[in-house]
Amino acid sequence: MGLLSDPVRRRALARLVLRLNAPLWALPVAWLERTMRSVGLEVYTQSFSRKLPFPDETHERYLVSGTNVYGILRGPRAASTESLVLTVPCSSDSTNSQAVGLLLALAAHFRGQIYWAKDIIFLVTDHDLLGTEAWLEAYHDVNVTGIQSSPLQGRAGAIQAAVALELSSDVITSLDVTVEGLNGQLPNLDLLNLFQTFCQKGGLLCTLQGKLQPQDWTSLDGPLQSLQTLLLMVLRQASGRPHGPHGLFLRYRVEALTLRGINSFRQYKYDLVAVGKALEGMFRKLNHLLERLHQSFFFYLLPALSRFVSIGLYMPAAGFLLLVLGLKALELWMRLHEAGAGPDEARGVPGPSLAAPPVQGVGLTSLVAPLLISQAMGLALYVLPVLGQHVAAQHFPVAEAEAVVLTLLAIYAAGLALPHNTHRVVSTQAPDRGWMALKLVALVYLALQLGCIALTNFSLGFLLAATMVPAAALAEPHGPRPLYAALLVLTSPAATLLGSLFLWRELQEVPLSLAEGWQLFLAALAQGVLEHYSYGALLFPLLALGLYPCWLLFWNVLFWK
């Protein structure tokens, strides 16, 4: 590669890094415009603003306004029909200034080459993911999150691939790659293989989930480390969060990765020149694309960078769990049929042709109240926390974000009283047939939801199935009711989220105390609601409108009178 082999370019990069060595407390829009124009790019800006549904205490923001800066390098050998993106996110507390310097150095180097067959967009976004979302919505002429932004004055071709860069230091020990995107989407596996190839060619250490590749697969340590990496990916994908700017590109069918420079205590370190060479190699390969990346897998799990688990291997695991629900529903259907027939007829013995008493119906009207009240509780869980935050903050000494979380927990806990409310309007005819019919409906409802989730986000579907299916199959009003109730509570969606947080930190080798875990759980609830309204993450509405009402049906079955 010819990147920065010239000493002049090395000194230019050193000056940029020195200029940007302090954090960018505010994006230097005018300076970025001048610098990009000086290297020969078409430079444009985009202003945007967004009012969050409630204050984001993690990033300390509520009314957000910022400016994105991007420069376009026109491909001299193309007609601006396709493009590539190199993006660097910045925020008020960002330490990503070294990545901005490397982006500008790459822009200056790419400008002097004549082999580009695609436009290259160099994008610096303000307020990290909010700026990225504003730019993507304006570029594709859509508005899915309600963000207000100015129209883009300059455009390139259809975006084929994107790379997001985050560097916290001008020297690194490894590059960590992040693939998990919004709602569990993943980039094409070929893009990840391309990154690994150029890291190996340049001698760069590349990591996945912050962990190096296992070197010894013959001993037990290698498979255990791979299992740990695999579980970390499953938990990150199941969260549905965009774990980097690349996660928002995937929504628009743009294959993207986020690369993070890690500066640890390892002895061997690499400067920005080595990172720039790897990026140049990736962009030169992507420049030769004749069509979008599609030959490799879009559904996979990664125990290591050099190994993957394809959809054909892991999907049967979810299928067998859903089969349990199907078999249990079939059993209940047969029991309902036998309960409606006479004892001889149930055994297949013909009886005398006497006038039989009227067969007792299933009592479908008795199911209307539990179904409606369960869905109403789910709708309240989705709507009321954000709508009632100001009222709660006025009457209680809490902030808006705390009011949202406390309202969520209050409505969630109020659902435990559901059986005592619904039994007042439920018909007392055929109580056994009533709970069996309700459980049959709940099993089919749960199986359909988990099946659809597993098709789009396997990690989330599998985690929910592994926790909810056993309790759902066992729940009935006969038997050890306290044991079944404890099992249902421990496998509820909220308990699954809490347990996943503890498992996540344990796999990261940063264990939590109970108090720290509870605080992290409350912060995760607030972030889940914010990400739904800010980026369109579907985990919160899925749990509130789908799985929580379904779980309440099983809770109702357990306490059926």
Label each residue range with its predicted role:
Residues 2-4, 14-27, 54-60, 87-96, ...:
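Second-shell loop/turn segments in exported
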Residues 46-58, 120-133, 211-221:
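Acidic helix-start/capping segments at beta-turn-to-alpha-helix junctions
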Residues 83-133, 414-418, 438-448, 465-477, ...:
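Alpha-helical metal-binding/catalytic segments enriched in His/Glu/Asp
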Residues 92-192:
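Acidic/histidine-rich catalytic neighborhood of metal-dependent amide-processing enzymes
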Residues 159-161, 167-291, 295:
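Active-site-adjacent substrate-binding region
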Residues 201, 236, 251, 260-351, ...:
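His/Asp/Glu-rich mid-to-C-terminal helical/loop segments that flank catalytic regions of hydrolases
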Residues 4-76:
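A non-catalytic alpha/beta surface segment that caps or lines the substrate-entry region
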Residues 311-561:
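Alpha-helical transmembrane segments of integral membrane proteins
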